[in-house]
Amino acid sequence: MMGSENDEESHLHSSKEEMEKLFLREDGDPLTKSNVNGDKSNSNYRSAMSTLFDSRHPSIVVTPADSDPLFAPPSYYSESRSPRSKPNGGDRVSSYLEPPSYADVIFSPFDDISEINGSEDGHSQSSDSLSRSPSSLSSDYIKITVSNPQKEQEATNSMIPGGSTYITYQITTRTNLSDYGGSEFSVRRRFRDIVTLADRLAESYRGFCIPPRPDKSIVESQVMQKQEFVEQRRVALEKYLRRLVAHPVIRNSDELKVFLQAQGKLPLATSTDVASRMLDGAVKLPKQLFGEGGGASSVEVVQPGRGGRDFLRMFKELRQSVSNDWGGSKPPVVEEDKEFLEKKEKMYDLEQQIINASQQAESLVKAQQDMGETMGELGLAFIKLTKFENEEAVFNSQRARANDMKNLATSAVKASRFYRELNSQTVKHLDTLHDYLGLMMAVQGAFADRSSALLTVQTLLSELSSLEARAEKLEVASSKVFGGDKSRIKKIEELKETIKVTEDSKNVAIREYEQIKENNWSEVERLDRERRADFLNMMKGFVANQVGYAEKIANVWTKVAEETRQYDRESS
């Protein structure tokens, strides 16, 4: 989506970056050791902040930080991070005596955090914060790494060479959880296996807020560069699996353990496509209409009626839904948990507030990006002006002004870099908003499971009442015939059998509904706790970076102001 814009920006800034690099080398500034190719990552900021429900993580060059700075120990020995630090020994000694600046305390340990925590990239820690379980804060751990994508050929014969290829990813799991029966596992999986895992979890854990899986974007796979698309999918899959293992219930599921441990082909039952489900439902429908199928199976009622497997059940639940909304009679059972209904409304309101905050975060990132780019362009413009002044200089005063202009250009370029670093950190911290927007979809799915289970209970109760009324009428009619009506007696026996099956299904459906209610409440309480912690960390990190980089930028311009103070004395 942003490919053409990225190419354009990289072309526009390539010459500027070379000039910037050369200019700073002349000045001997320690920042020449840092990465100056930040514009490529800048082009990804807009995409990262505007894609609200996309599970991909932006390719950001995180320059100084990989973890929450407020929990990092201060370091007083950084030479290249503070504008006050000098390469000579005397100033290094004075740095022990002076109290460190806020920027020194906040940013000096950043480069070492990833090594301490064993993080392999800058994106892993922010993605792990979402759906954090209490056990993740203890000594127990489970770490997922997705790497080494490979193209493989389908086993089936194809007339088109290379026409049936797919990408597999190596998924490595390291854990000390005893339930997994080992400490390290490595398997290869394709995207279809991810879809199967997500479907099995959705069936087995109704009422839970299961993190949404990445979408299979056919369009982007055709438009984007193949290597870029594969890398984005790899990051998205890693982020998804890390969220699953962070869930306190899903992490112990048999489905996830099989997915992470079973070698070879995934032994989970594959997902049935919509066409096959519709065909199965069409085959069963005539038998159900003629009464050969009996009542609803107690095994099937624990799954939602939608999907096409059981047309008759779909029609019955649709009729019940219409009757609930437009009928004059009250349903046999209704949602009476007022506290839950209030919480449900608050969750919907929360989603709207997060959407609004996300839009403002996008605007902030764009403004910071524009500020950094403009400041860099200003510095490069003064570089050219300095070169002109030096070439045309005749008097020493002209050369002095050219030197001051060079210092101004250097400061503008440094400030531009700090804005880029700040923007990178802003994206990392405020990306929590977009993660929670995706999680709101899972919350809605959990609430939909509850509504679907309630509708199934209502439908079965209505059906049971109708069957009992029919059986009672047949018994009354049969009692009026001397000796009994054999055909009616047979129908009564069939109805009683259907009533028994429906009664069992109703009991199973009620138990399923009660279980989903418990799951909903436990998930809502868990999300409330984790949201408070995640949002607090987000705000702490965001504010700390704003303050730290503001001080860095202020120090840059303070140095320029001190060096040019002589002009004030001359004018006075």
UniProtKB/Swiss-Prot annotation:
Residues 32-53 have a biased composition (Polar residues). GO terms for molecular function: phosphatidylinositol binding; phospholipid binding; protein heterodimerization activity. Its main location: cytoplasm. Pfam families: PX (PF00787), Vps5 (PF09325). Keywords: Cytoplasm, Endosome, Golgi apparatus, Lipid-binding, Membrane, Phosphoprotein, Protein transport, Transport. Residues 318-572 form the BAR domain. One of its GO terms (biological process) is late endosome to vacuole transport. A 1,2-diacyl-sn-glycero-3-phospho-(1D-myo-inositol-3-phosphate) binds at R190, K216, R233. Residues 124-136 have a biased composition (Low complexity). Residues 9-30 have a biased composition (Basic and acidic residues). Residues 1-97, 114-136 are annotated as: Disordered. GO terms for cellular component: cytosol; Golgi apparatus; membrane; multivesicular body membrane; retromer complex. Ubiquitously expressed. The modification Phosphoserine is found at S133. SMART domains: PX. The keyword Cytoplasm applies. It is found in: Cytoplasm; Endosome membrane; Prevacuolar compartment membrane; Golgi apparatus, trans-Golgi network membrane. Disruption phenotype: Reduced rosette size and inflorescence length as well as root gravitropism defects in snx2a and snx2b double mutant. It is a peripheral membrane protein. The keyword Protease does not apply. Residues 147-266 form the PX domain. The PX domain binds phosphatidylinositol 3-phosphate which is necessary for peripheral membrane localization. Belongs to the sorting nexin family. Plays a role in vesicular protein sorting. Acts at the crossroads between the secretory and endocytic pathways. Is involved in the endosome to vacuole protein transport and, as component of the membrane-associated retromer complex, is also involved in endosome-to-Golgi retrograde transport. Homodimer. Heterodimer with SNX1 or SNX2B. Component of the retromer complex which consists of VPS29 (MAG1), VPS26 (VPS26A or VPS26B), VPS35 (VPS35A or VPS35B or VPS35C), VPS5/17 (SNX1 or SNX2A or SNX2B). This is Sorting nexin 2B.
